[in-house]
């Protein structure tokens, strides 16, 4: 496992409304951000991107916004990758697996999920100590539950909490409260 470095390069996978809002929040906070979506029209939406670019220019931000046409391109040099795909087990497993294969070993995986066990998702990667889930609104500052599997690396957990703090959230780290269903299913077979 590569040593932890500061989380400065962020990949956002999913450029729907929430993904774009979160990406803009990251750039405003000074992060180098790459945004990717499976639907290129979301990235190239003239009105949406013009608004984002005008906002960024008007605020003279220190962060940078890059657009990627593939997940591989988006996560190539990411310190942290966060997805905004539907909160369904199959979708999350697919995107976690894809990012896990394509991103450098140091990359932290993060996902907003109100229902899925991060322990399950982490167990399907080669980096279970670097996987986290957030619960709460990512569009307005406030309290966020930062869920981690029992195997989480404390230094990485601290870095992820600091990242969300820089975005004006109040992360509350806690161990995954959800029963890992995938592991239960495997044990029962």
Place the predicted regions along the sequence by residue.
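Short glycine/serine/threonine-rich phosphate/pyrophosphate-binding segments
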Residues: 19-21, 90-94, 116-118
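Rossmann-fold dinucleotide-binding core
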Residues: 108-176, 180
